[in-house]
Amino acid sequence: MGGNLGVFVRATFLTVVITVVGSAAAGELAATASKRIPICHGYSCNYRTMLALGPADGARFRAILRAGAGSPQAERSAISKAVRYFEQRTFRAIGVRDLPQSEFGASRIRGQMDCVDESTNTHALLVYLAERKLLRFHKVERNASRGLFVDGRYPHWTAVISDRGGTEWVVDTWYAPMGGAPDIFPLSQWKKRGVLESGALN
């Protein structure tokens, strides 16, 4: 009986070890697996260019997010760096550098992005990071909007994340030039902005 018990204990131990190692290996595989992401451009996703993120990209994102694993604030800083790298890869895929904000009359111009394109692409990146379990302190939320013209604000969209405390944060890439740092601050503050002042968007 004692011998059988010993065999059972060893078998159980090996099962646990294999499960843990297997889960870790699966996590590593997911983090480096290739992914094709459709990149919107031309305003309101008039065009879509496929961006292939391979193992090298996965390793780069993993290193970036690992550096922000210490706190929610550090992770948001890492997300900013991940967005900048993602936009550099986007530029290489499309071959055209997007200008900051949106120029009226630039609709259907390949490579130029309005806030719909920007928020859609950023959301896709955040989902990519979440799928690979690279976000420890935040989860991806639905994109948010503000502005209705009648309230003196031009309609504007942004990607959104939330922290464990429930605070929602925008990841708004529209204002910066392509590859620049996105605006990351509370959604509640973002909702109040965007009033037309001196002919410019705030």
Segments and roles (model prediction):
Residues M1-F13:
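Bacterial N-terminal signal peptides that target proteins for export
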Residues A11-G22:
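Bacterial N-terminal signal peptides
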Residues A24-A33:
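Boundary at the C-terminal end of the N-terminal hydrophobic targeting segment
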Residues Y47-T49, I64-R76, F104-D117:
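Second-shell loop/turn segments in exported
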Residues P55-T90:
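N-terminal, post-signal-peptide region of Sec/Tat-exported proteins
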Residues K81-H138:
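Mid-length scaffold segments of soluble, non-membrane domains
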Residues V127-W190:
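Hydrophobic/aromatic-rich core segments of domains that either
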Residues K191-N202:
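Low-complexity, Gly/Ser/Thr/Pro-rich intrinsically disordered linker/tail segments
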